[in-house]
UniProtKB/Swiss-Prot annotation:
The gene is axl-1. One of its GO terms (biological process) is negative regulation of Wnt signaling pathway. This is Axin-like protein 1. Residues 287-298 have a biased composition (Polar residues). Residues 305-392 form the DIX domain. Residues 190-233, 278-306 are annotated as: Disordered. Interacts with bar-1, dsh-2, gsk-3, and mig-5. Residues 4-132 form the RGS domain. Disruption phenotype: Worms exhibit defects in excretory cell development and axonal migration. One of its GO terms (molecular function) is protein kinase binding. The lineage of its organism: Eukaryota, Metazoa, Ecdysozoa, Nematoda, Chromadorea. Keywords: Developmental protein, Wnt signaling pathway. The keyword Transit peptide does not apply.
Amino acid sequence: MTMRSKFSIDRVLHDTAFAKWCQKEESRNADSITLYTSILDFESKLKTGSPSLSLLKLARHIHRKYVSLNTGTCHVIGDSIRTKISTRVHEVLDGKPPYIDLFDPLKQPLFQHLRSMHTEFSTTTADVNTTWEDASSTSSSNKGATIWFNEDAIDKSSRHEIGQSTVTHESEDDRFSFFNAVCTRLNSLQETKNSSETEEHAESPRKEKSSTPYGTDGFAPPPRSTQTNTLKVSNLPKRFESLYKKKRQQVATSDSSGFGSNASDFWSFERYGKSNQGTLERPNRLFTGTNNGFSTLQPKRRGSEAPKMTVELRYENDVPMVAKISANHAQSVTLRYFRHLFGLHYTDNCRFFFKSTCEDGSAQYQWTLLFHDDDILPVFQNRITAICRMCPPPEDHDLI
């Protein structure tokens, strides 16, 4: 690969806008960017002498997430190349030392795909910029247009009329004159509105003063009903009955003839909010049935519970531990969530194996070893099954 190509791929890998653009459509395969970055990270760690265990974890992660024909997501690479890389990674996991060109067959197809996508991205961005520049130039060409201010279209009945005039904004004095004209016009409109409101308020008291409580027939309207404020004391519990018997109706004194007597009875009912035994009573429904305000609240109905999925963990020579989780999240359970669910701490001498479908079809299932917290746990027969094996801390010379 030439220096020019290397410079181009580095620029593409660090282009944030390009990465977001690739994520908008699945056909652009945004995982190809992450895969190329992971390959460069593997080569960098190998050159700096990182521990073999760390290199094995990274190689297995690259193979499982991006390259494998069963679980890989980078579909822009041909099946033959992916099969070749799978063979190489399995050889390294079986004991062969990691080498610098382990993932070299992937670079060329990844580079071609990224270059093609970045060319399309650059063309799309250039079209948007051209459209924006055309719109900006059209907008700027209209800045010197003449504005015609016609006050007749606003209001011809105002006391202060500016008159039809031509207003320009080419100089500071013209803009200041236009500002003063607008302010004068707005002030006159506000004064007209305030004066009309003042006249309306001045006329309204005279109308209210001439009003009479008597109708057209010469009779006063009947007193308002106080039915909504009355309660039947006999229907209340005994512990609340005394609260309503302490105060009786207090009728204001007046002469027993004419309109004054009826008015005093009405205002006493309105003031105390209750009546004597002859007043219409409220229907007896406060303390019966489900509407009783002092009864126990009805329990809420439980909705249909979501289906559950079993998660099982077993240590060697020990009984299994089981947890239930929502089946809706079965395809997104990570190793981090699994350890948090059972309260586990990952150490170098602890290995988690998960039951999954056999990749080569030679057995009914296989035990898959997971390292990274972001790895998605496999679901086998509608459940997640794991075993934990303890082993002594590995040494670099034991893995080679």
